[in-house]
Structure formats: C-alpha cells, structure tokens
From Swiss-Prot:
Quaternary structure note: Monomer.
Binding-site residues, DNA: 91, 110, 151
Classification via PANTHER family: FORMAMIDOPYRIMIDINE-DNA GLYCOSYLASE
Protein name: Formamidopyrimidine-DNA glycosylase
EC number: 3.2.2.23, 4.2.99.18
Cofactor binding notes: Binds 1 zinc ion per subunit.
Assigned keywords, A-Z: DNA damage, DNA repair, DNA-binding, Glycosidase, Hydrolase, Lyase, Metal-binding, Multifunctional enzyme, Zinc, Zinc-finger
Named cofactor requirement(s): Zn(2+)
GO molecular function, one term: class I DNA-(apurinic or apyrimidinic site) endonuclease activity
Role of this protein: Involved in base excision repair of DNA damaged by oxidation or by mutagenic agents. Acts as a DNA glycosylase that recognizes and removes damaged bases. Has a preference for oxidized purines, such as 7,8-dihydro-8-oxoguanine (8-oxoG). Has AP (apurinic/apyrimidinic) lyase activity and introduces nicks in the DNA strand. Cleaves the DNA backbone by beta-delta elimination to generate a single-strand break at the site of the removed base with both 3'- and 5'-phosphates.
Family, similarity comment: Belongs to the FPG family.
Length: 270
C-alpha cells in the first residue's frame, strides 16, 4: 500500500504538470472504486483550473476554485502524467485531460482507491480527525508523550494511529522504532519523554529519507512517471528477519502485531 512517502513522491511528480492547468475533459472508465466516483464529477471539474496539488496524510487534493478532488491511492493505485496520445491501460479508471496536452491517469488494479468531490476538504469526514503531519512543526516528542499517558497500547500501534500522527505505515514504523531503540511491543504509556524525542526524530528522518528516494516499492507502487521507489534498498529491519542487526549483529526477530509483520532487534530495542 502506498504510504506517506509514496503519496508525497506522487504529489511532487504530478504538481508541475497539473498546477495552473485547465481540466478540459473528465473520463471515468470505471466508477466502482472503494467509494463510487461521483456521477457529477465532470460537472464540477471540466473548465476549471487546478490551483494547487496538496497532500494531507495519504490523501492527495486537486484544489480548484470551487472545491477539491480528494484522491486516495488505496492498495495499488498510482497517478501518472502521460502524453496526449498514449493509449489507456487496463485499470486506468479515471482520467483528466489537461490544457497542456497532458493527461492525469489513475490506475488501480484492486480498486481500493477513491476519487471524491468536496467543497470543504478540511471538514470532510476523512480528513477532519487526522493527527498532525510527521514532518510538520506540530509533531514532536512532547506531542507523543502527552498523548501516550496511561496508554496500554503497544508503541508500534500507537504511532500507526492516524489520530496520533498521520502517515507512519507499517514499514516506516518498523524502521523508526529500530532507529530509536524502542521495542515495538513496549506500552506507549511506559516510554519517557526523552525516548519519545528520539522516536519523533527517527520518524522524521525515516520518512524524509524515503521521500528523497521516491518511496518504497515492494510490490505495486510506481511513481508518477511509472518508475519504482528505491527506499527498499535502505531498509534496516523490515523484511530482514533472521539477518544480523546492523548495530550488534544479533539476528533480527519477526513477530505479528495486528496481523502485520514486525521486525526488531531483541538486543538493541528495549
């Protein structure tokens, strides 16, 4: 599933081609996504100019003068900017024809993504209750410490909660906890402020590095020009169960938490 770095990579890729462009035509080949594509989407978009392409958590927004399109990539979705004469591919469900002879195409084999229309994106039910962005000034160790008091939740589950902080998916939670030296099953309420400062910094460092490398491609994700991300080559623990820890050479262990793979060093992470 595309996580925050993959979605941010997509935003950076499509924004230069979309911002300031007029949407000449909307093509919906298959409206049956996670939620049905609005039947009147073309009425809202055609003839309108894309003022900005922004990201909030794992959602992308195409902001127009009258409202915004909310796009989620789901499990396997991607947005690509292509030349005007490129034929449509299988699973190209939604397409915007732009005034610069480019097309923005949404491809989603599993159809868990979405295209929605809203006139007030900040108050949309999908957005309004989200926690802070992990790369923003609002997110720090003090924030994690304050929200974690009395929490019996494992810290890995805690930082993956979008009400606490957005965009820390399974891969990046594994990596950040390793860098911070914190065991993924340690109770969130039993972690000190100092250790939360280290964890917040590890989350920022991990996500920033992943964005610079175009995200992590393990199966489905490709960016806006159809190329994979390369952060998988820099992973320290995720997918490396049994390999020696890069810090102490102890074999890394794998457990399941909430039915997700969790890899950690039993010596370095406490």
């Amino acid at each position: 599933m595309p996580e925050l770095p993959e979605v941010e990579t997509t935003r950076q890729g499509i924004a230069p081609h979309c911002e300031g462009q007029t949407i000449q035509r909307v093509i919906v080949r298959n409206p049956s996504l996670r939620w049905p594509v609005p039947a009147d989407l073309a009425e809202h978009l055609e003839g309108k100019t894309i003022r900005a392409v922004e990201r909030r958590a794992k959602y992308l927004f195409l902001h127009l003068e009258t409202g915004s399109v909310i796009v989620h990539l789901g499990m396997s979705g991607s947005l690509r900017v292509i030349t005007d004469d490129s034929p449509a591919m299988t699973h190209d469900h939604v397409e915007l024809v732009l005034g610069n002879h480019r097309r923005l195409r949404f491809n989603d084999p599993r159809r868990f993504g979405c295209w929605l229309w809203t006139t007030d994106w900040n108050r949309h039910p999908l957005i309004s209750a989200l926690g802070p962005e992990p790369l923003s000034e609002d997110f720090n160790g003090a924030w994690l410490f304050r929200l974690s008091r009395q929490k019996q939740t494992p810290v890995k589950s805690f930082i993956m909660d979008n009400h606490v902080v957005v965009g820390v998916g399974n891969i990046y939670a594994n990596e950040a906890l390793f860098k911070a030296g914190i065991h993924p099953k340690r109770k969130a309420g039993r972690i000190s402020l100092d250790r939360y400062h280290k964890l917040a910094e590890a989350i920022r460092e991990t996500l920033s590095a992943a964005i610079l490398m175009g995200g992590t491609t393990l199966r489905d994700f490709v960016n806006s020009d159809g190329k994979p991300g390369y952060f998988a080559q820099s992973l320290l623990v995720y997918g490396k169960a049994g390999a020696p820890c890069t810090e102490c050479n102890t074999p890394l262990k794998e457990i399941r938490m909430n039915n997700r793979s969790t890899v950690y060093c039993p010596r370095c992470q406490r």
